[in-house]
A protein has these predicted regions:
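N-terminal glutamine amidotransferase
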Residues: 1-68, 72, 101-196, 203-214, ...
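ATP-dependent adenylate-handling active sites, centered on carboxylate activation for C-N bond formation
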Residues: 8-14, 85, 104, 125-130, ...
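A short, aromatic/hydrophobic, helix- or strand-capping loop or linear motif
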Residues: 27-35, 90-95, 141, 405-410
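Structural signal for conserved beta-strand scaffold positions within catalytic alpha/beta enzyme cores
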Residues: 44, 91, 183-186, 252, ...
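Short, polar/flexible loop-turn hinges at active-site or ligand-entry regions and domain interfaces
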Residues: 83-92, 107-109, 160-167, 300-302, ...
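Acidic-aromatic/histidine active-site loop/patch
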Residues: 98
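Conserved S-adenosyl-L-methionine
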Residues: 184-185, 423-432
Length: 525
């Protein structure tokens, strides 16, 4: 995944910078470098995925300007071919095009990128720093100010805690220049609603998702797939299996007692002919990993933490037992096509508003989870449902078509792939939350553990000291206390707990799990 960090002033304390930067070395264990630009420091931990030679090591330099980028730029070859008329390239790295691109187009370059990225540029001519993040926030970036008021940027909040008083996520779809954050893209906004008929919409969804998977299979390192047996990851794997000349490698995880996902994942793996691995996790592993997972994530959010337990342990197994470096996942489908709770949306307009809210906040929840669970194990996450062309198109589709008006949630996505991509029962399987589907017992163990830590009086007393995102269950209090241990006073990095829209009838619940909704039905079976 790589890790980047920047201190934007000439009076940097190198040892403090180095100490903060070391905290994310697992994101890029292949090589590390910190350089003094003359006006500050830039750091880079490398995980080599594209252009595996030493020439691909960052920071890249061009006439006194520098760039560090944690990113994947799709279709960079065409851009590089055009730039090669004026510039010389030394490596096969996709990120080497960034400085020539900046030289030609300035900050307008960010609108041109089909990429997931976080970057910091030092402009040697203007003697100033520019930072930017992709429109969804798939690649992480945080910022804060030190005691002297100097801005710092880093891949994770843990790099900056202790150096900056207040750490915040860098807003997706923005760049920073001259002391201001400027929005260059609002991926959730819709300029013109698409009123194509159902079959045309589904055809476009199919073609655009296939293209999104296709471009994410390109890597100089080995690629694998997380397969839960749910609709989203199963589609990614099925598409990839068709594109690959040999069996793809798929991985699934579940509790030893009651893993719902494992049987469905195996059914998909058998159907698409993948080389499939099942990993079993135990109650002891879950509880032993909890504090480390919260420290890794940098969140107190209940559903993010629950869903991270299985994902973290699975990625840990992959890191320790295979030579795979890249993992494709199924995140971002729910935000586009709907959750179980969006069945309760009172109107098409409300459905669309909720989808836009979820897309704009993704970087604090599911995208954060996937990034941290995968990167802490020195792997790279790629998210086909986050393909910019795909997201823009689905967001533009008439929301009346995206609502559950066909008797099945995510009907457009399911109908788009009817045929022989997946077994019918998988394609039309009811949604189950990942944290539930790895085994209902996992969430029950976490709740039970938290319940045993506090009396009712202690619970009420401890909750009172929190004003932002106040804990409301013993489980949420436990997570908050662990979070505060490693990120003291930084709770505003997360806007609030991820919960269904409580203003909708049927959604005023006290737990983020879809299990508590009246329409959960057969999802957990």
């Amino acid at each position: 995944m790589c890790s980047i960090m920047g201190y934007c002033d000439c009076c940097a304390a190198f040892s403090d910078f180095e100490e903060g930067f070391k905290k994310t070395v697992s994101r890029g264990p292949d090589d590390s470098r910190i350089i003094d630009t003359g006006k500050g420091l830039l750091g880079f931990h490398r995980l080599a995925i594209m252009g595996l030679t030493p020439d691909g090591m960052q920071p890249f330099e061009l006439d006194g300007s520098y760039v560090v980028c944690n990113g994947e730029i799709y279709g960079y070859e065409k851009i590089k071919e055009e730039l090669a008329k004026k510039y010389t390239f030394k490596s096969g790295s996709d990120c080497e095009i960034l400085l020539p691109l900046y030289r030609e187009y300035g900050v307008d370059m960010f609108k041109m990128l089909d990429a997931e990225f976080a970057l910091i540029i030092y402009d040697g001519e203007e003697k100033k720093y520019i930072a930017a993040r992709d429109p969804i926030g798939i690649r992480p970036l945080y910022y804060g100010y030190d005691k002297k008021g100097v801005i710092m940027f880093a891949s994770e909040a843990k790099n900056l805690v202790g150096m900056c008083g207040h750490v915040m996520p860098f807003p997706p779809g923005h760049y920073y220049k001259d002391g201001e954050f400027v929005q260059y893209c609002d991926i959730a906004a819709v300029d013109e609603v698409c009123h194509d008929d159902l079959e045309t919409v589904c055809k476009n969804i199919r073609e655009k998702l296939i293209a999104g998977v296709d471009k994410r299979l390109v890597a100089d390192a080995k690629v694998g797939f997380l397969l839960s047996g749910g609709l989203d990851s199963s589609l990614v794997c099925a598409i990839a299996a068709r594109q690959s000349k040999k069996p793809i490698r798929t991985f699934a995880i579940g509790m030893s007692e009651d893993a719902i996902d494992l049987k469905y994942a195996k059914e998909v793996a058998d159907y698409i002919g993948s080389y499939h691995t099942e990993v079993i996790m135990t109650k002891e592993q879950v509880l032993d990993s909890l504090e480390g997972v919260i420290r890794m994530l940098g969140t107190f959010d209940i559903t993010t933490i629950r869903a991270s337990m299985g994902m973290y342990l699975l990625c840990k197994w992959i890191h320790e037992n295979t030579d795979i470096r890249v993992l494709l996942t199924g995140e971002i489908s729910d935000e586009l096509f709907g959750y179980k709770y969006t069945d309760f949306a009172p109107s098409a307009e409300e459905f669309q508003k909720e989808s836009q809210k979820r897309i704009r906040e993704l970087h604090m929840y599911d995208v954060l989870r996937a990034d941290r669970c995968i990167s802490v194990n020195s792997l790279e996450a790629r998210v086909p449902f986050g393909d910019l062309d795909f997201v823009k198109y689905v967001m533009s589709v008439d929301p009346a078509k995206k609502m559950n008006t066909y008797g099945k949630g995510k009907y457009l996505l399911r109908h788009a792939f009817e045929g022989d991509y997946l077994p019918h029962d998988i394609l039309f399987r009811e949604k189950a939350a990942f944290s539930d589907a790895v085994g209902h017992s996992m969430v029950d163990y976490l709740k039970e553990y938290a319940e045993g830590l506090y009396t009712e009086e202690e619970f009420k007393e401890k909750c009172e000291k929190y004003t932002h995102a106040k804990p409301f269950t013993k489980e949420s209090l436990l997570y908050r206390e662990i979070f505060e241990k490693y990120y003291p006073g930084q709770s505003e990095m997360i806007v609030d707990f991820w919960m269904p829209n409580k203003s909708w009838e049927g959604c005023d619940v006290n737990d983020p799990s879809a299990r508590v909704l009246s329409n959960y039905g057969e999802s957990g079976k």
